[in-house]
């Protein structure tokens, strides 16, 4: 069950219009390393984590990523809300306007629509958490690139906060990965997966031959 609070995780109050930056920011909304993909990745992977520790972490982080989506939507909207049609055309957003006017739509910075092909679920906790750690590092790198592209403190502040959350998430996933890895090394070769009914992973000891 989800509970919605009518406030952002970090305040967003952008005063200056910047269509160029709006065009860049959308990549962290609907791009390959963006927050929408992260939320869907974790909320799907959580169901086949082997215990409540893993399920809880992926639920918590996946839910937080939905809050990050809301932050980015707010930032993009504020950056372009007062733009004229001529300004949108000059910024290369005329194709977006043709289909969506000033409404939001998840794409990357090149206008490529969001796709679920950006993330995977395997049912293997170690494989999925490895992907999650890589995803957080890539998102951090993109936020750093975006920060380089603006000098507006009203934009930089939320981006710095989002970047820091990627670092925290990476650390939490790393801890979970090491926890499951240690569990298997200690001889627990059948990590129970709960998905309505009990299922068992095949012996995974071969992961740890070294």
Locations of regions flagged by a protein language model:
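Non-heme di-metal
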Residues: 1-210
